[in-house]
Structure formats: structure tokens, C-alpha cells
Amino acid sequence: MTSESSTPTGSTRALPASITRSSSSTLSTRPSASTPASTGSLTPSTSTASLVVSPPPARSPVVSTRATATTRPRLAAERPGSATTPCPCGDTDKQLAPCLQEGAGFVIRNAAVRLYMRFGRVWFWHCMLGLWGVGNLIW
């Protein structure tokens, strides 16, 4: 079965019967006896699987030893290379004075620091810790 429909240009064309009317193409379904009626909420789970609690994994003695070991910063004498790198400044105020008077050193938290410029970067020597550091020069 076909019916005619007009197009925007006024011509008519044949349409298949299944789309002539939207009400005739919509099928109604009846709930079957095996399909439960929907209430809009989730149905309780009917799984037969049982919950088994597994024991916690065994702790490795090596991992616990590492986790509980205390860490402290190395002293200057313990650091590699510290014996061959002399500190350009001293530990006392009198020893710090020459570093500060040269204009190349300054004090950060009561520790002398020497600055050096190389390759566009600032290198600094922390006298108290015996460490080198580097940073970018920002003007």
C-alpha cells in the first residue's frame, strides 16, 4: 500500500505505507509474564557469588627496614669530593668577612655563599654545606 505526499515544489510522490503516518508505524508492546514491570529503581542483586576476604600481603623485611631507617643529610666530610674542594669562606664571622667584602659573596641564613658566573648561569658555593648550586641569571 502506498500513499501520495506533496513536496515543497508541489509535485507528488509515492511513499511506502510504513511511514505514511507515524501512529501506524509505532508498535505497542505488552509486557510479557517473564518481563518484570519497571519501577524506575534498580533491582537488588541476585548474585550467588560469595565474598572472600584475602589476608593482607606479607611485608618484606627489606622494605620495612628502608621505610623505618632515619635519613640525615651527609656531613661535608662524608660527601664525595668534599676533601678535594676547599671551602673559599670560613665558619666564623671573621672568616666570612673577606667573602662579603669582595662583593662576590653574601649571607643566606647565616651561611656564606660565593657566586660565580659562567655560561650565562650563576653558580654558587655554599660554604657551610660544601655544596655547589646553579641557577639562571634573571635581570
Curated annotation (Swiss-Prot):
Membrane-spanning parts: none
Biased composition (Polar residues): 1-12
Low complexity composition-biased segments: 14-53, 60-74
Region (Disordered): 1-86
Tissue: Embryo.
Keyword Protease found: no
Protein keywords: Phosphoprotein
Location of Phosphoserine modifications: S60
UniProt entry tagged with the keyword tRNA-binding: no
Primary role: Involved in drought, heat, cold, and/or salt tolerance.
Protein name: Stress-related protein 1
